[in-house]
Amino acid sequence: MRIPRIFHPDTLTPQGGETDLSEDAANHVGRVLRMSAGQALQLFDGSNQVFDAEIVQAGKKNVRVRYAAGQTENRESPLHLHLGQVMSRGEKMEFTIQKSIELGVNVITPLLSERCGVKLDGERLEKKIAQWQKIAIAACEQCGRNRVPEIRPVQTLESWCAEPDNGLKLNLHPRAAHSINTLPLPVSRIRLLIGPEGGLSADEIAMTATQGFTDILLGPRVLRTETTALTAITALQVRFGDLG
């Protein structure tokens, strides 16, 4: 049986010790997995270390574990990827976040654009961002990453594109002259823009060009927004990262 991996939001002592799991983790371990004292876990706290652990006490609302000294396990790609994803409807955004993290994305910023079909504000938006961060944690627990990517607050497309960045800035465009295979080597940082289901407006495309974004073409077929993100990330990891 595979040993469950559990994220711990507080820094763990490198030499080992005891700690109570977070409320979310305790609920997952105690109620969902139905684990009990004596069973093994693996903890990670975002420091790129993993900690072998054993449950010493398991109640309905509290789980306490004893953990050994940490061991460094770096599973991060040499390519730093910042995904700017215009928010999509329903579960599509959740799917994009989950799979992008499995593929090695480091930062995700949800974006608002002219043709964005998602209308969220205030408390609903805060709850959605918290939910997306939980999805990011669960994705890391599943795929073996020991650093949890950041889900940043929602921004407008214009403000995100205007942020200083010393990496390569890419925007997918169906009539672009460049493909990923024609991009120059080496590249260690990329800011990747994925537009909404209806695409970016002409003014938005022009704006990305003034902000230093390079238009690239993925291929001859039209992809859905959630497919576009994952296809682009995979291709970039194959060329510049740790896939393939």
From Swiss-Prot:
A cellular-component GO term for this protein: cytoplasm
Record-linked SUPFAM superfamilies: alpha/beta knot, PUA domain-like
Name of the molecule in the record: Ribosomal RNA small subunit methyltransferase E
Ranges for region Disordered: 1-21
Known EC number: 2.1.1.193
Annotated localization: Cytoplasm
GO MF assignments: rRNA (uridine-N3-)-methyltransferase activity
Keyword Transferase listed: yes
Catalytic activity from the UniProt record: uridine(1498) in 16S rRNA + S-adenosyl-L-methionine = N(3)-methyluridine(1498) in 16S rRNA + S-adenosyl-L-homocysteine + H(+)
Gene Ontology terms describing biological process: rRNA base methylation
Record keywords: Cytoplasm, Methyltransferase, rRNA processing, S-adenosyl-L-methionine, Transferase
Domain of life: Bacteria
Natural source organism: Dickeya dadantii (strain 3937)
Family listed: Belongs to the RNA methyltransferase RsmE family.
Main location group: cytoplasm
Oligomer status and interactors: Homodimer.
Keyword Transport: no
Lineage: Bacteria, Pseudomonadati, Pseudomonadota, Gammaproteobacteria, Enterobacterales
Role played: Specifically methylates the N3 position of the uracil ring of uridine 1498 (m3U1498) in 16S rRNA. Acts on the fully assembled 30S ribosomal subunit.
